[in-house]
Amino acid sequence: MNASQDTIYAQASEHISDFQFDNRVAGVFSDMIRRSVPGYTQIINTIGDFADRFVKPNTQVYDLGCSLGAATLSIRRQIQGRDCRIIAVDNSESMVTRCQENLNAYVSDTEVELICGDIRDIHIENASLVVLNFTLQFLPPEDREALIAKIYHGLNPGGLLVLSEKIRFDDAPIQSVLEELHLDFKRANGYSELEISQKRSALENVMKPDTLTLHQQRLTRQGFSHFSLWFQCFNFSSMVAIK
């Protein structure tokens, strides 16, 4: 996955459009997410480790919101020879096109079905692992519960959901300090104040983070009885829930 440098918001613009996973973003996404999301590489690698432990032979794996395929590739490396199928879904044609190129670059005996479509329309069945890696936060809040319910019903007993999300905090001082530390992380990775400000404006209407408590309550309501936060750096997190 050769990454071009993200300079999308480097020039001042009078009108900042809502963030979209279009061709411009797809072309720099690997660089963008590495410089914007603390711990992203660790999360991707650990998703593969979870797959090694939870994916059962002759079952299916779902990567919902697969972007360029980083999680799918991490999973596929760990489940060779299990006669499984990975269903990777993204609603951005640009992302799916580049994802297919990334998948084609590696030989594997594990089938990947790559779908350009809405994750809310995907039928989930016989699943031993479902991954939502920084995806749920982009759905309208009113649609999130139904998706979690669909995932729960499509998972086999003992199956795992990995849910990575930017989170918000009801505690104002905690929200403030962790948000500022995240901005420092982006500054340290070469983003200017202009880039940070303009991207924040672009994301304002399309990404709505939940609190960790809300995530856990939603998962519990839909039937998940085992839950843990396994990763957090500033306001970025990854959780697991077992059916």
UniProtKB/Swiss-Prot annotation:
Belongs to the class I-like SAM-binding methyltransferase superfamily. Cx-SAM synthase family. Keywords: S-adenosyl-L-methionine, Transferase. Pfam families: Methyltransf_25 (PF13649). Homodimer. GO terms for biological process: tRNA wobble uridine modification. GO terms for molecular function: carboxyl- or carbamoyltransferase activity; S-adenosyl-L-methionine binding. The keyword Hydrolase does not apply. Its EC number is 2.1.3.-. S-adenosyl-L-methionine binds at Y40, G65, C66, S67, D90, N91, D118, I119, N133, R200. The keyword Glycosyltransferase does not apply. It catalyses: prephenate + S-adenosyl-L-methionine = carboxy-S-adenosyl-L-methionine + 3-phenylpyruvate + H2O. Catalyzes the conversion of S-adenosyl-L-methionine (SAM) to carboxy-S-adenosyl-L-methionine (Cx-SAM). It comes from the Bacteria. This is Carboxy-S-adenosyl-L-methionine synthase.
